[in-house]
Amino acid sequence: DKIELEVTKHWEDNSNINGKRPISIKYLVSGNNKTKEEIVTGNTTTDENWNYKFTDLPKYDSQGNEIVYTIDEQEVTPGDLKFYNKSITGLNIVNTFHVPDERISVNVSKHWEDNNNINGKRPESIKYVLTGEGNVTEQVVTGNTTSDTDWNYTFANLPKYNSQGNEIIYTIEEQETNQNDLKFYVKQANGNYKNGFNMVNTFKVPLETVDISVNKHWVDDNNANG
């Protein structure tokens, strides 16, 4: 005797609003130490075309016992279901959108272009400001005033994805710890959050001008001699 088993699927992802649903999936039906596989391509915004019927499955094993079949699904391409949790009840598979709680670290390094602070204008500390998805993390770092030692910092345990499953893009900025700490420096940020940021501070005297008032007084009896 032969039987048929139809696998049904439901996506809990608000019609794929975040664009993370794969275009295809692999179904597996296993029984009596044998497995059949089938790749199914379905609609990326509805549940349409995601069901599949396995046919011509033996009902009994060689001892006449009814075979118990189980189903499962696998990714066609690695990462296809990264943003989904799956739940299997009988022959129904439910995939629920879920953002994994992955964490990353962002490294910040610094280089001073000031001839080892020969002019004595380098500050003792600096504030690094890391921004991602509107969230701001600040860190004050105190470093060596004649070298690049101790100016690096690592922002750790940062969320990798936002609530839509998109990778968060982090940007870096530095600020003065005290007013005018960087008055004699031009700052430049290089790199990115994936490979690390490098902050370069180059010594430069600002082009500031001052006004000088000159007062004159004539001691000549009001120019009596012409």
What are these regions (language model features)?
Residues 1-226:
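Solvent-exposed loop/turn and edge beta-strand elements of beta-rich ligand-binding domains
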